[in-house]
Amino acid sequence: MQRVSRLKRELQLLNKEPPPGVICWQNESNMDDLRAQIIGGSGSPYEGGIFNLEIIVPERYPFEPPKIRFLTPIYHPNIDSAGRICLDILKLPPKGAWRPALNISTVLTSIQLLMSEPNPDDPLMADISSEFKYNRAVFFSNAKKWTEKHALPAPQGSDKESQEKSGSSEGTSHKRKSAEIAEESKKPCREP
């Protein structure tokens, strides 16, 4: 019961006072299944992109963190090809920093900040992390191309293309260029 009333309050607050560049809503009639959109921050390679996220609220929320993943493909050292996010507040202690006092709005704001300021020292995508650390211009260019391809709104009149770019189409692939990103470069998020 505490979970349901808290979720209702959080959704009302997110609806009434959303963080800048963040939208969150209930998917269908299931309160445990939320969707969110984060607008890429200005000055970042994700600028102007609309990134869709899936939020699954666990039965033990707020004592367990929500499960969040990107539905829109994104070129980022802390987000893998399945959309999983390496962020300490998405994990329970001792490996993570989730606390019941945190809420979905705080988590979405933290993800938005992670998009602007990647953490190359705790990557999910080692090759992208190396690129970010040692060749920032190439990283920026690649991330910008991914944003243009997958996250920018399509020109008016192209509904199918718009769905594909936003990641909302059921058939959209969340796989990266597998030839360029070798399987061995994908490793689990390092423990702090």
Curated annotation (Swiss-Prot):
The lineage of its organism: Eukaryota, Metazoa, Chordata, Craniata, Vertebrata. It catalyses: S-ubiquitinyl-[E1 ubiquitin-activating enzyme]-L-cysteine + [E2 ubiquitin-conjugating enzyme]-L-cysteine = [E1 ubiquitin-activating enzyme]-L-cysteine + S-ubiquitinyl-[E2 ubiquitin-conjugating enzyme]-L-cysteine. One of its GO terms (biological process) is protein autoubiquitination. Its main location: nucleus. Pfam families: UQ_con. The keyword Chloroplast does not apply. It is found in: Nucleus. It comes from the Eukaryota. Residues 178-192 have a biased composition (Basic and acidic residues). SUPFAM superfamilies: UBC-like. It is an enzyme of class 2 (transferase). This is Ubiquitin-conjugating enzyme E2 T. InterPro entries: Ub_conjugating_enzyme, UBQ-conjugat_E2_core, UBQ-conjugating_AS, UBQ-conjugating_enzyme/RWD. The active site is at C86 (glycyl thioester intermediate). Its EC number is 2.3.2.23. Keywords: ATP-binding, DNA damage, DNA repair, Nucleotide-binding, Nucleus, Transferase, Ubl conjugation pathway. Belongs to the ubiquitin-conjugating enzyme family. Accepts ubiquitin from the E1 complex and catalyzes its covalent attachment to other proteins. Catalyzes monoubiquitination. Involved in DNA repair. GO terms for molecular function: ATP binding; chromatin binding; ubiquitin conjugating enzyme activity; ubiquitin-protein transferase activity. Residues 2-152 form the UBC core domain. The keyword DNA damage applies. Coiled coil: none annotated. Pathway: Protein modification; protein ubiquitination. GO terms for cellular component: nucleus.
